[in-house]
Every structure is written in structure tokens, then in C-alpha cells.
A protein has these predicted regions:
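Unchanged
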Residues: 72-157
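Conserved beta-strand segments that form the floor/walls of ligand-binding pockets within enzyme
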Residues: 26, 54, 66, 98, ...
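A broadly conserved sequence feature marking short terminus-proximal activation segments
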Residues: 1-3, 156-162
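Conserved Nudix-box catalytic region and its N-terminal flanking loop in Nudix hydrolases
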Residues: 45-88
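Short connector loops at helix/strand junctions that flank enzyme active sites
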Residues: 22, 37-41, 62, 67, ...
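A generic fold-level signal
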Residues: 1, 39, 48, 107-110, ...
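Acidic, metal-coordinating catalytic segment for phosphate/diphosphate chemistry
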Residues: 1-44
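Conserved hydrophobic/aromatic beta-strand scaffold that supports enzyme active sites
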Residues: 5, 45, 55, 114-116, ...
Length: 162
């Protein structure tokens, strides 16, 4: 989000050069910069003991398969958010969790932190967000996820790291 008015005093911001940052929204009244903000989210490829990836269909987009994803709550670490989202969206408990990298999602004004997780058992989501899920081989997951999507990039990063 790009600020146009100061969140503290409401004054319209001006652009001021700040070091290597270039022009930054600046409040003359509060004498401080307001850097652009974005949401930080997790996206996790949950895998079973066979190395299969859990693909899900959400109620809001039933035509597309996705990975477990969600927003990080205030005071929550990225790892805790990944474990929480896995529990909420699959009913599974992550036995391992490995950070894979970060991907900017410009359309959603988000930074996605990617993880690989392993879990045992079969998914039983307790979420109204999830329509269905299935286990897929790594290659089937790459083919099934939207071309160029962050989900596809996370799965390819896991595949290529082995």
C-alpha cells in the first residue's frame, strides 16, 4: 500500500528523497517517512511420506488447484503461521517444515514466504474455504498448478532442491 496521507495526523504526504530509497512519502508535520507496506503471507507445499504434494480446490476458485496458504497474524512467526494454516486447511500436523524462499505477489500486494512441509495421515479439512483436496506426484503438481504461479514455483523449488 502506498500512503498518500499520514496515518498519524492525516496530513497529505509529500515526496522526499531519502538516501538510497529514492523518493519516499514524507509527513512534514510528524517529520517522518511512510514507506510502502504489504501483507506477508505463507504458502506451503504439504507432502506425505511418499513425496506426494497436497493440492486443494478452494470454494472461491473451484476451477484452480492451489497449495496451503494464508496471512501471517500479528505476533505470529512465519513458521507458526504455516503450521496453523496446515492444521486449519488440512486437519494435518506438520512433522517437518523447511523454508524455501520468498516470492513477491504484486497483484495482491503481498510477499509470499514459501515452505515445504511433511505430514502424516489423510487430510480432513475443518475449513469452509476448502472444497476438495488430493495427493499428486511432484510432476503432476507442477503440471496442475497454474503456469507461472507462486504455488508452481514453490513446488519446482522443492523438486529442484532434492
Amino acid at each position: 500500500m502506498r500512503y498518500t496521507h499520514c496515518p498519524d495526523c492525516g496530513q497529505r504526504l509529500s515526496a522526499r528523497p531519502i538516501g538510497d530509497e529514492g523518493l519516499v512519502p514524507w509527513c512534514e508535520s510528524c517529520r517522518r517517512p511512510w514507506f510502502d507496506t504489504f501483507s506477508t503471507c505463507i504458502i506451503t507445499a504439504v507432502m506425505n511420506e511418499k513425496g506426494e504434494v497436497l493440492l486443494q480446490r478452494e470454494t472461491r476458485r473451484p476451477d484452480r488447484e492451489v497449495l496451503v496458504a494464508g496471512y501471517i497474524k500479528p505476533g505470529e512467526s512465519a513458521e507458526d503461521a504455516a503450521r496453523r494454516e496446515i492444521r486449519e486447511e488440512t486437519g494435518l500436523t506438520a512433522t517437518t517444515l523447511r523454508y524455501m524462499g520468498s516470492w513477491p505477489h504484486m497483484e495482491g500486494n503481498m510477499l509470499m514466504l514459501g515452505f515445504a512441509a511433511t505430514a502424516e495421515g489423510e487430510p480432513s479439512p475443518d475449513s469452509s474455504e476448502i472444497l476438495s483436496d488430493r495427493w499428486a506426484t511432484m510432476e503432476d503438481a507442477v503440471r496442475s498448478l497454474r503456469e507461472g504461479s507462486i504455488a508452481q514455483q514453490v513446488v519446482m523449488a522443492i523438486r529442484d532442491h532434492k
